[in-house]
């Protein structure tokens, strides 16, 4: 990821401060009316956007580092899990809960989106929900596969329908 910043001429070491300011700017602009921001990274004169979003824009923050989890707890409306070892998920969720408590944000609504092999069965989704997961991220193609996607759309739709019938339709509402 550092090379992405190098290509753009952006300092990798300011990425945390940069996203903090970007979130403040997004929330300020989405609130309606004129907004200005004078931070260490960005300096915006009094500006506004139109039309203003009809509802608050949910901000989901990803990452497994303590800095990312603290940022999600402090500034986010939710957290995006980046995948990995399923056995590590409870510890990540516990760290996130601790950061939310420390930030005083544990009483507000908060989404937890998780990539997990448990997302593909009814019992697995229930196990995730029992851990505080609100949403699962599912895919039917390995996300890190490089090269062209040659699977026909009809096959993708078949997989999606099968998932809807075997998992989504069987969730308690």
Regions found by a protein language model. Give the residues of each.
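Active-site-adjacent structural elements that line small-molecule/cofactor binding pockets in enzymes
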Residues: 1-173
